[in-house]
Amino acid sequence: MIVKKMPILQGFPDFETVKFFTGKFFQKYNFTPVFYDIETTGLSRNSTYLYLIGAVGIEDETWNFYQWMAENANEEETILRIFSQFLQQCDLLISYNGDRFDQPYLEARYEKYGIPSPFTGKQSLDLYLTLKPLKSLLKLSAMKQPCMEEFLGIKDRIYDNGKECIKLYKDFLKKRDAFTADEILGHNLEDVLGLGRIFDMLGYLCIYDGDY
């Protein structure tokens, strides 16, 4: 398994910004959020598997970025168990389309291995669903994450999209080369850091709702 951890020193919303906006949605909240994104070998929860999780959490008053990547299908269960442990102190999960894909996918994989769901009792902020009312207001062509980032003027993505990453991962399983692994990890890093950037669009939602 490939494991990465690094502090996020810039390009992510500060604690007070995250606390302010999440506080508008959740009253019973102790501010232990986790931003996360997953990479899988396909969309089906039953015939494909999880191979990478990227997450951002708070440690020692610093945002830290974590990644766990399977080097073969047998490591999926280990990643699921590690992520479950990681979420023990978390009370809010922040994702993009996570309510419709990431969380249901993970729930199915946890069930497959007989592992209790780590999502029980935790709140979820799906930025895709939450920001959807802004599509017409901001005249967005689509609600995909890269489209939202482009609206914000963020055009610094350099890695392949999720679909291409599936092909890259299959190549990685054959070749085991570090360059391909870095390509996959880089895409996931951009997705997770993108969550922080899109999070700031909750400010537009306050204007939309007249809450300013």
Features from the language model and the residues they span:
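Acidic catalytic cores of enzymes that act on phosphate-bearing nucleotides/polynucleotides
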Residues: 200, 205-212
